[in-house]
Swiss-Prot record:
This is GTPase Obg. GO terms for biological process: ribosome biogenesis. InterPro entries: G_OBG, GTP-bd, GTP-bd_Obg/CgtA, GTP1-OBG_CS, GTP1_OBG_dom, GTP1_OBG_dom_sf, OBG_GTPase, P-loop_NTPase. GO terms for molecular function: GTP binding; GTPase activity; magnesium ion binding. Residues 160-328 form the OBG-type G domain. Monomer. GO terms for cellular component: cytoplasm. Its main location: cytoplasm. Its EC number is 3.6.5.-. Mg(2+) binds at S173, T193.
């Protein structure tokens, strides 16, 4: 399935139904009076976060969504039928922006979360509504109120516990394919991964986390160079970053600093996220190279550095356990800090 993380669409809620002019007509009742009913309410445009979706690709082919008009009123004071809402399902983590691409209207960050983005128009009033002591037979009825319409941008920020970052060819796709059931494209050239990939890592029945392989970042990624500007946003929701450094490529300190600079320059608080630095591809290095490059990384970063090999699976279990512990701690801290929330499926309004 193709990946698409942003889309522009048009949405319009339904117009309200029209009120009608009608009079009571029964045998032996010469002047029955007005009994025209009101129009029904137009359909709403509702967005819902669906846990089984992970791309906005469907919106490439369907870009216009319109709800139906409410039913017209009828005699005998009958109100027109309300139109059904149009439910638009999007992946969890989708943000809805106004046409200016800056004003956020909604953030659907929980499965089942809903928002009414455009409210249907109210129905027009029938002539029964306008009856007064001085106007016993009004012939006035209102048209339904128009619905709301707007162009909006959908922007998907994947929700993963761990974000894999590193320069192109750092071994991120290989790592993801080995530790999870994900099958990203793997080859020995830069930018093999053109779209974010998700995988689920299960250490036990009760322990699992979602890991995202973010396409390779390069110098200037935060300004749009390479593929990074588009995909740095996917890292924002991760609890911890696993920074893979290609140990066989040479200058490991420069590689680490390049990515750190891009994370710090991006305005999503990425630099403050917990980071685990891993010296990758130790199967292609001598013990002396592993030791010297590990020490150089630790000196430059001021942090402990783990070593691993995605190809030979060396030290993978230790790294996964470290990631799981960090993710668990972050989840517990977030749970303690979060205020009580209503059950999923609640509706909000934009």
């Amino acid at each position: 399935m193709k990946f698409l993380d942003q889309a522009k669409i048009y949405v319009k809620s339904g117009d309200g139904g029209d009120g009608v002019v009608a009079f009571r007509r029964e045998k032996y009742i010469e002047f029955g009076g007005p009994d025209g009913g009101n129009g029904g309410r137009g359909g709403d445009i509702v967005f819902e976060a669906a846990g089984n979706l992970n791309t906005l690709i469907d919106f490439r082919y369907t870009q216009h969504f319109r709800a139906r008009k409410g039913g017209n009123g009828a005699g005998s004071d009958r109100t027109g039928a309300a139109a059904a809402p149009v439910l638009i399902q999007v992946p969890v983590g989708t943000q809805i922006f106004d046409e200016d691409r800056e004003t956020m209207l909604a953030d659907l960050d929980q499965p089942g979360k809903r928002i009414v983005l455009c409210h249907g128009g109210d129905g027009g009033r029938g002539n029964a509504h306008f009856k007064t002591s001085t106007n016993r037979a009004p012939r006035r009825a209102d048209k339904g109120w128009p619905g709301e319409e707007r162009w909006i941008w959908l922007r998907l920020k994947l929700i993963a516990d761990v974000g894999l970052v590193g320069l192109p060819n750092a071994g991120k796709s290989t790592f993801l394919s080995v530790v999870s059931a994900a099958r990203p494209k793997i080859a020995d050239y830069p930018f093999t991964t053109l779209h974010p990939q998700l995988g689920v890592v299960r250490l036990s029945v009760a322990e699992e986390f979602v890991i995202a392989d973010i396409p390779g970042l390069i110098e200037g990624a935060h300004e749009g160079a390479g593929l990074g500007d588009r995909f740095l946003g996917h890292v924002e929701r991760c609890a911890v970053l696993l920074h893979l450094v290609d140990g066989a490529a040479g200058d490991v300190v420069k590689a680490w600093r390049t990515i750190r600079h891009e994370l710090e320059a991006y305005d999503g608080g990425l630099a403050a996220k917990p980071e685990i630095i891993a010296l990758n591809k130790i199967d292609a290095m001598t013990p002396q190279q592993i030791s010297s490059r590990r020490r150089a990384l630790e000196k430059a970063s001021g942090m402990p550095v783990v070593t691993l090999s995605g190809v030979t699976r060396q030290n993978l279990d230790d790294v996964l356990r470290l990631l799981q512990d960090r993710v668990t701690a972050t989840r517990e801290a977030a749970r303690d800090a979060a205020p009580p929330q209503a059950a999923a499926g609640r509706e909000e309004t934009a």
